[in-house]
Amino acid sequence: MKPFEYGDEEIGSREIGFAVSSTIIGIGALSMPRDIANQTLFSDGWIILLLGGLICAVLGWFVTRVAILFPKQNFVQYTSAHLTKPVAYTISSILVLTFAALTAYESRMISVISQTYLFSDTPIQLLSFFFLLVVIYGIAGSRAALLRLNVLFLPIVLIAIVLLSLLNINLMEINNLLPAFQTKVSQYAVGVKNSIFTFIGFEVALFYAVLLNNKTAKKAPMAVAKAVMVNVLSYILIYVTCISVFTYMTTRGLTYPTIELGKEIEIGGGFLERFDAIFFTTWIITIYNTTAMYYDVASLLFCAMFPKVKKQIFIFISAPIIFMVNMIPSSLNTLSSYGTYLAWIDMGCVVLAPLLVLIVYKIKRRNGGNETPS
């Protein structure tokens, strides 16, 4: 059966903004309040979330701005033209492996959490296998359709976040948020560095910019920055709710505080006692989007390096490898460490490569007068 494909395979700035926001909201948001609470005192974590988010918004704006300098050129093409082909292929190969590994990481994490909260009797291997199958089905077809799917799913997730806070309002204690500004300045610096990884996902704009239509391409950098800030506000809301309901000391001891918030909700005197199951089921949607985006970017880069290889061939060869890789970590701590390493590699490549491209591009423009990229 031939997969359906859009005739234009183009997207606008709105779609790329939704894609960025959907990619950022993932597994990390479930443990984010604990990670931030371990870096700060009381409710001070909102400050490092805001600062880290602003930095990522600027980085997202920057990488997208660089990408749109080369309309209808993919990442491999313009990095090859400005950084030489060997350098471009080396960076792209590292990114393909990183995004494929992130796909494995997300698949394993969602399987572990699903087993903990929903499917206690189902083996992790089966959960991971079926989740990966659904991801493969999603990315095997139209790339534009996959990106437009974020426009449908993201509002549902954002509504779930707002409901999570509103339905816990009767359990909130303002005193749990006080006193304010008790964290040392040096600890803020460490916290901001760690909080930046919370908003990783903006880099997908660097690779999907090739699909932007000419009418809205110039709006894309600001759309990406706004998308990151939507996540910042959502995360601050989740964090403040966790601290006000649990206290910051209790939040530090919870593995997934965001899900635990759902467990505290009761509607109508026991009418709805498992809101956490509904919330987590909704959250699987955005984790699916995150995983699909990373896997699709890996296929996009690989096929850009080797144009004769079709996307479907890459997927069906790499999928079994990804499944085997996601079974390697023996514990949750090991898995989390892998996630941190991948985040460092991801962040380093997607910031350094566009920066070098921009420097070389400016030098060429200066030497070549009013030369513009083809």
UniProtKB/Swiss-Prot annotation:
Ranges that cross the membrane: 16-36, 44-64, 86-106, 122-142, 149-169, 192-212, 227-247, 279-301, 313-333, 341-361
Localization in the cell: Membrane
Membrane topology qualifier: Multi-pass membrane protein
Key words of the record: Germination, Membrane, Transmembrane, Transmembrane helix, Transport
Pfam families: Spore_permease
Main localization category: membrane
Gene Ontology biological process terms from the UniProt entry: spore germination
Superkingdom, taxonomy of origin: Bacteria
InterPro entries in the cross-refs: Spore_GerAB (IPR004761)
One GO cellular component term noted in the UniProt record for this chain: membrane
Function: Contributes to the L-alanine germination response.
Family, similarity comment: Belongs to the amino acid-polyamine-organocation (APC) superfamily. Spore germination protein (SGP) (TC 2.A.3.9) family.
Family matches, as NCBIfam families: 2A0309
Protein name according to UniProt: Spore germination protein GerLB
Organism: Bacillus cereus
Name of encoding gene: gerLB
